[in-house]
């Protein structure tokens, strides 16, 4: 096996998906602790102190305790290199989350044991299903009261339409939580409370049918053995192929806050989840072990570091190897660029990178030339598919408090739009600036970031726009005719694309009927 193939085989790139408050930030920290990437996990409960969760880095996230932006963390674990992508936990950020899920090979679903499957989890699973992403499941919060575990598995199967195969099974919960039993390998992992901040040696009891196990379970022993018989009779056994096909999820139980069970999940990702997978481009399928470099940008993030006024483009490497100072072709612009200062995200510590392989996520400094969906290669003309822009559902007109700052406002909005955090439209017939978003929180985020990072204060006004549609028409004459007729409702988006802002649903239906040669698109691929 070549050095490159060996490095690719070591890579595991996955994202965490969950409903807000299911414990995603906590589990992220504990995973980093496993990889020794952070020495002490600052519990999310001590939010008021300075120990903010390592992955929630933007000011507004610190205040609200939700991860709004996707951060990327890389850490070593058991001779592997793990790339963990944290996805926004708030329902408003579906676009950002969707794009993040295009950059991973597997996902970890975190469920709150007291609540089970929640709406946000369902939406994220729908996205994973589009690509048959393999899913590992973690039922969290066993240090509190949880629902009946069998009921939780039934719910996963019924609601998420995926087979659930329990790997570990909880022994009690809340104050009676004694640990978990490994179904296939017949041993108990003992839970001891109060070790949330550090890695501790794990106590194991070999064999359920042993005096030690009887002593540990006490009066619960017989009831637990009966429950296990029921579980083993009723539940699916783990099947590696079904897992890789996205049809079955292995289920683990634990408490992220108590730092228990997180290592079992990480072991599952390393042992069972796929190494970097081939990627489909319009031109051909790209294999990760190919010698030539290729990668695509799935996210742009402004101002990751208040000390550096910068924008970072996050790129998933699809093939080949990145070497410091190498020359790459920016396919959309046709320009060759030398990349000497790509970053790796070693738990939000930004480090200069010497080399990286397929599956890794690297950061490129972006001075406004890179867009989401851009492909970089060593010369070949490739464009990777499936990185969409969605038409926003909510619109507001932006009003500037200080008219002298209109340049900063435009610059700020342009950069935030490049990030995909919002969409910005400039109407052809007025000097208005219109923002589009998928959820209300995005407007708050934009206003707070404009104030925080660009020192611009703005407010919003309602505007009658029902929806936006990207205009596509191969007949130039027809397009010109349409543009003249519809000019009152036409705008250009942040990327320079012609957009129709429909005032009502009826208007949109009429226009589509009246102009059959013009395509009104609700999504637009980044390319």
From Swiss-Prot:
InterPro entries: EF-G-like_DII, EFG_III/V, G_TR_CS, P-loop_NTPase, PrfC, RF3_C, RF3_dom_3_sf, RF3_GTP-bd
Keyword Isomerase carried by entry: no
GO cellular component, one term: cytosol
GO molecular function: GTP binding; GTPase activity; guanosine tetraphosphate binding; translation release factor activity, codon nonspecific; translation release factor activity, codon specific
Principal subcellular localization: cytoplasm
Residues that coordinate or bind GTP: 18-25, 86-90, 140-143
Location within or outside the cell: Cytoplasm
A biological process term (GO) from this entry: regulation of translational termination
Pfam families reported in the protein's UniProt record: EF-G_D2 (PF22042), GTP_EFTU (PF00009), RF3_C (PF16658)
Record keywords, A-Z: Cytoplasm, GTP-binding, Nucleotide-binding, Protein biosynthesis
Domain tr-type G: 9-277
Database matches in CDD domains: RF3, RF3_II, RF3_III
Coiled coil: none
Function: Increases the formation of ribosomal termination complexes and stimulates activities of RF-1 and RF-2. It binds guanine nucleotides and has strong preference for UGA stop codons. It may interact directly with the ribosome. The stimulation of RF-1 and RF-2 is significantly reduced by GTP and GDP, but not by GMP.
HAMAP family, per database record: Rel_fac_3
Similarity section: Belongs to the TRAFAC class translation factor GTPase superfamily. Classic translation factor GTPase family. PrfC subfamily.
Official protein name in the record: Peptide chain release factor 3
């Amino acid at each position: 096996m070549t050095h490159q193939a060996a490095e690719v085989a070591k890579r595991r790139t996955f994202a965490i998906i969950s409903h807000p408050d299911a414990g995603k930030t906590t589990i992220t920290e504990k995973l980093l602790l496993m990889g020794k990437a952070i020495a002490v996990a600052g519990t999310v409960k001590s939010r008021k102190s300075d120990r903010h969760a390592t992955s929630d880095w933007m000011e507004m996230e610190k205040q609200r305790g939700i991860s709004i932006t996707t951060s990327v963390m890389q850490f070593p674990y058991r001779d592997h290199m793990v790339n963990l992508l944290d996805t926004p936990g708030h329902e408003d950020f579906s676009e950002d989350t969707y794009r993040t899920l295009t950059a991973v090979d597997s996902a970890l679903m975190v469920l709150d044991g007291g609540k089970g499957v929640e709406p946000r989890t369902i939406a994220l699973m729908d996205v994973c299903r589009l690509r048959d992403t393999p899913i590992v499941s973690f039922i969290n919060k066993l240090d509190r009261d949880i629902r009946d575990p069998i009921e939780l598995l039934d719910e996963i199967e019924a609601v998420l339409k995926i087979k659930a195969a329990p790997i570990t099974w909880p022994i009690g919960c809340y104050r009676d939580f004694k640990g978990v039993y490994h179904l296939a390998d017949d041993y108990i992992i003992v839970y001891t409370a109060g070790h949330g901040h550090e890695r501790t040696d794990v106590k194991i009891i070999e064999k359920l049918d042993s005096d030690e196990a009887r002593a540990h379970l006490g009066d619960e022993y017989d009831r637990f053995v009966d429950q296990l018989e029921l579980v083993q009779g009723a539940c699916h056994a783990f099947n590696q192929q079904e897992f890789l096909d996205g049809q079955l999820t292995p289920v683990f139980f634990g408490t992220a806050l108590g730092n228990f069970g997180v290592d079992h999940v990480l072991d599952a990702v390393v042992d069972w989840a796929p190494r970097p997978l081939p990627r489909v481009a319009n031109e051909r399928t790209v294999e990760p072990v190919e010698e030539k470099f290729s990668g695509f940008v799935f996210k742009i993030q402004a101002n990751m570091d208040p000390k550096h006024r910068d924008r970072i483009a996050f790129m998933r490497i699809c093939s080949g190897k990145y070497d410091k100072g190498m020359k790459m072709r920016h396919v959309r612009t046709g320009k060759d660029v030398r990349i000497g200062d790509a970053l790796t995200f070693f738990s939000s510590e930004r480090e200069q990178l010497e080399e990286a392989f397929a599956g890794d996520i690297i950061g490129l400094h972006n001075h406004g030339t890179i867009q989401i969906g851009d492909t970089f290669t060593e010369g070949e003309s490739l464009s990777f598919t499936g990185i969409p822009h969605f038409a926003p559902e909510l619109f507001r007109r932006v009003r500037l408090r200080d008219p002298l700052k209109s340049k900063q406002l435009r610059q700020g909005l342009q950069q935030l739009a490049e990030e995909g955090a919002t969409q910005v439209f400039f109407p052809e017939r007025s000097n208005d600036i219109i923002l589009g978003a998928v959820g209300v929180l995005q407007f708050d985020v934009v206003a707070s970031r404009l104030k925080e990072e660009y020192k611009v204060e703005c407010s919003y006004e309602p505007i009658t726009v029902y929806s936006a549609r990207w205009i596509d028409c191969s007949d130039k004459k027809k397009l010109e005719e349409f543009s003249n007729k519809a000019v009152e409702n036409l705008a250009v988006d942040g990327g320079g694309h012609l957009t129709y802002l429909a005032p009502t649903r009826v208007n949109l239906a009429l226009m589509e009927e009246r102009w059959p040669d013009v395509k009104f698109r609700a999504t637009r691929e980044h390319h």
